[in-house]
């Protein structure tokens, strides 16, 4: 908490020296009708109608987010990650408040609607060799020239003063080259460094990027494409494997890894419960089919059926029971 206050206060003294790069979009974005402020889709449609160039569209979206969302200091440590992304964005639009994840998801939602490949990056930050006390979230966009750039709408939205958020726009973290972003932002997953030779945590903490080029080149674009095709559970497992591969030394990285393991445990449990429910439904189906045979037998096998049809009335439920038994055995203990 003290770190964030210090960081944002530090930024406050540099704001006056920053040119207003938003001058070519702010007047237009301030004129957006109230009817188009209620969803990311409507905001994106407005931007698309007013701007055609890539840089202008992204800048307009960024400006809208940082100028319309204020840092919610009262809920800094109480982010509800259970709600869906759509619900989180809707609440951010309605309340005009949020912490880093709200800024990031709101910005991502708009630029995604505009057709850009935007990813949310989670990690931790530092300023003047002081590491933040809590993790952080920002964005990265793959531009049409296939180059990745980083964006941090939270840090560009204002600063804290005397326990209150002061709205003061900046552009220091707008469209930053990945290697520059790494001076202050360290992703938990090295994939999001967008470097051929990813740096280590130790390099980040010391501020000295060695980038061992004797290593094999890391094809991050291919890895990202494969990663995005995975299910959420598989993505978490993918992240876990990369964190194990590189090691995780910092306090926040260790905390993220512990949360990651718990998330995977929950996914595993939920998957087992779903499988158990499916097995139960299939077993009941077998019971119903077998009861049909019992009723038919009690009716003295009337009306008449061919032998192969009668055998099928027995073999089908028995096959279901056998399959259920095998699935239960593979499932093991649940709960």
Label every PLM stretch briefly.
Residues 1-20:
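Bacterial Sec-dependent N-terminal signal peptides
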Residues 63, 105-175:
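Hydrophobic/aromatic-rich core segments of domains that either
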Residues 18-95, 99:
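Secondary-structure boundary elements
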Residues 4, 38-42, 105:
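A generic alpha-helix surface/boundary motif
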Residues 21-24, 46-47, 161, 189-335:
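Mixed-charge, low-complexity segments
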Residues 100-104:
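Gly/Ser-rich catalytic serine loop of serine hydrolases
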Residues 39, 53, 88, 177, ...:
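Helix N-cap and loop-to-helix transition residues
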Residues 75-78, 142-218:
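Active-site rim recognition segments
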